[in-house]
């Protein structure tokens, strides 16, 4: 794992604990914020594993629920079983064979008797085919139910596997989070954000289309702020790297639409920066650099 990636994550977890007042934070206070962020990561590991276990249990329960639907096929009289459909189709086939034999052996001098027998056989075939069609509909409903259950089982299992993968990476993350390099960069991000928060928010507000920054979700808002810190204030990461890292954080901590939203806003921030590249925006000390 890259130290800076972990530092960004720690900073994101620590942002929410920054005081609302403009008072300067001491180094000790910032260190305490990072320790709280590390504890939050540890708690997240346990929660992730618990959620994965619950999803596996639900998958197992759903599979058991699908058994009666599949076992119904073993009874030829059970509506909706594949054997029931086959039985009814064979019945229709026998009626058709009888009809064929009757037509071949028909005696022309007695057309009325032939007509009556043929009509009766045709009616029997129609009934048999109708029954087979109904049985097919029942079977399709059963298969649809089973397919729906299996789809949910696959989704739950995949989520559980993903959660376990995240949890397995946590010990390494927690270990690296203790390093001086990681803590120093996280402190740098938090300090810059605390110092230039108003200017950063003004920059982001300009890039938002039809949104107010304060109405954006807290996680997404903090991710955007930290990305602007890296791109424009500290100029510590190339623009592409800062945006990509922000998108990854949004995928991990935001809702399903967060990543696309964060990417779009930051792209507009960069476009705005390029438009004013020939001059310096006085609202940001590092504006125009860090590309």
From Swiss-Prot:
Keyword Manganese included in the entry's annotation: no
Pfam families reported in the protein's UniProt record: NusB
GO annotation, biological process: DNA-templated transcription termination; transcription antitermination
Record SUPFAM superfamilies: NusB-like (SSF48013)
InterPro entries given in the database record: NusB-like_sf, NusB_fam, NusB_RsmB_TIM44
Keyword Transcription among record annotations: yes
Keywords for the protein's UniProt record, in alphabetical order: RNA-binding, Transcription, Transcription antitermination, Transcription regulation
GO cellular component: a single term: cytosol
GO molecular function: RNA binding
Known role: Involved in transcription antitermination. Required for transcription of ribosomal RNA (rRNA) genes. Binds specifically to the boxA antiterminator sequence of the ribosomal RNA (rrn) operons.
Family per similarity comment: Belongs to the NusB family.
Stated name of the protein: Transcription antitermination protein NusB
Source lineage: Bacteria, Bacillati, Cyanobacteriota, Cyanophyceae, Synechococcales
The encoding gene: nusB
């Amino acid at each position: 794992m890259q130290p800076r990636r972990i530092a960004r994550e720690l900073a994101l977890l620590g942002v929410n604990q920054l005081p609302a007042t403009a008072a300067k934070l001491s180094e000790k206070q910032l260190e305490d914020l990072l320790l709280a962020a590390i504890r939050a990561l540890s708690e997240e590991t346990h929660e992730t594993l618990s959620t994965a276990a619950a999803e596996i249990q639900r998958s197992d329960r759903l599979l058991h629920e699908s058994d009666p639907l599949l076992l119904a096929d073993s009874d030829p009289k059970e509506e909706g079983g594949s054997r029931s459909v086959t039985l009814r189709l064979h019945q229709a086939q026998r009626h058709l064979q009888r009809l064929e034999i009757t037509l071949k052996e028909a005696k022309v001098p007695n057309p009325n008797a032939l007509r009556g027998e043929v009509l009766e056989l045709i009616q029997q075939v129609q009934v048999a085919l109708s029954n087979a069609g109904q049985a097919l509909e029942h079977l399709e409903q059963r298969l649809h139910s089973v397919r729906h259950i299996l789809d949910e089982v696959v989704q739950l299992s995949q989520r559980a596997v993903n959660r376990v993968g995240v949890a397995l990476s946590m010990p390494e993350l927690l270990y690296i989070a203790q390093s001086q390099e990681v803590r120093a960069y996280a402190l740098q991000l938090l300090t810059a954000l605390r110092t230039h928060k108003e200017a950063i928010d003004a920059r982001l507000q300009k890039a938002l289309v039809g949104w107010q920054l304060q109405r954006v979700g807290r996680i997404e808002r903090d991710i955007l702020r930290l990305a602007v810190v890296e791109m424009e204030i500290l100029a510590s990461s190339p623009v592409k790297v800062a945006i990509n890292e922000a998108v990854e954080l949004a995928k991990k901590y935001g809702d399903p639409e967060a990543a696309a939203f964060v990417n779009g806003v930051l792209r507009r921030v960069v476009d705005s920066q390029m438009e004013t590249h020939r001059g310096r925006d006085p609202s940001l000390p590092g504006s125009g650099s860090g590309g």
